UniProtKB/Swiss-Prot annotation:
The keyword Nucleus applies. Residues 100-124, 138-148, 160-182 have a biased composition (Basic and acidic residues). Keywords: Nucleus, Repeat, Ribonucleoprotein, Ribosome biogenesis, RNA-binding, rRNA processing. This is H/ACA ribonucleoprotein complex subunit GAR1. GO terms for cellular component: nucleolus; ribonucleoprotein complex. Its main location: nucleus. It is found in: Nucleus, Nucleolus. Residues 98-182 are annotated as: Disordered. GO terms for biological process: pseudouridine synthesis; rRNA processing.
Length: 182
């Protein structure tokens, strides 16, 4: 059953968190030294002190302990002053632990998953299906005592009783011959 999430209203967080302070302007973008403990999502909205959206996060730069962010302003007239603090929505941050190296236990679990042997498919479930390339064909399992061209059933495909090609060992030599029509 498919779910339709388009009708569901998404609640937007109005809680803001400090993003950082403006260092300088470079090629029409603001460069900020990040003051928040987490890293903002790219394209997340950036707010000024009056909670007005002034732009979006464009690029994230620097080391994990010294992060800088560039902001693409919506319009050039709202460019802020150096040293001004900017904000972002609290739910628009990625925890820093996602960017840190994984713990040894997680690495060991992943390695064990790679080493774990995959269960082989049950041979009985395969049956006698013909394979496309080089597999076992249906005719290859015929018993050696059967002869090719021998009709096993007395009923033909048309639904009539067919004559058997087998010699049933009749005592009369003419019994197995087809009699000509007059």
């Amino acid at each position: 059953m498919a779910r339709n999430f388009n009708n569901r209203k998404r609640l937007k967080s109005t809680e803001t968190a400090e993003l950082g302070k403006i260092l300088y302007m470079c090629q029409g973008q603001l460069v900020i030294k990040l003051a928040a403990k987490d890293i903002p999502y790219p394209n997340s909205p950036v707010l000024d002190a009056s909670s007005k959206i002034i732009g979006k996060v464009d690029e994230i730069l620097g080391r994990i302990d010294d992060v800088h962010v560039t902001i693409k302003p919506d319009d050039q007239c709202s460019i802020s002053k150096e040293g001004e603090t900017l904000f972002s929505y609290a739910d628009k941050f990625i925890p820093k632990k996602r960017f840190l190296p994984r713990e040894e236990t997680e690495k060991k679990k992943e390695e064990m998953d790679r080493i774990k042997p995959k269960p082989k498919k049950d041979q009985a479930s395969k049956g006698n299906r013909p394979r496309a390339f080089g597999g076992k064909q249906r005719g290859s399992d015929r018993k050696p005592d059967r002869k090719w061209g021998v009709i096993q059933s007395n009923w033909s495909k048309g639904g009539r009783k067919a004559e058997s090609r087998k010699d049933h060992g009749s005592k009369r030599p003419d019994a197995n011959r087809v009699k000509p029509r007059n």
